[in-house]
Amino acid sequence: FYIYGEVQRPGAFRLSREMTVMQALATGGGTTARGTTKGLQIHRRDEIGRISVVEPRLSDHLQPNDVIFVRESLF
């Protein structure tokens, strides 16, 4: 998976079996002081190559090649 935006260590990481969004955020070092877990987005490619945007819960499991975007908090 790949994680970018307001995280301490953006980049590509190995997806562990049954990894949740919360565990992925921890792998990326957590959010920055400006980041928020509200409004997270996962960009996910389907079998025919279309990309959909999913707003996950922290307990949702990742899929191979998911891209997580962490937004900046407005407050």
Locate predicted features.
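Ser/Thr/Pro/Gly-biased, low-complexity, turn-/loop-rich segments
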Residues: F1-F75
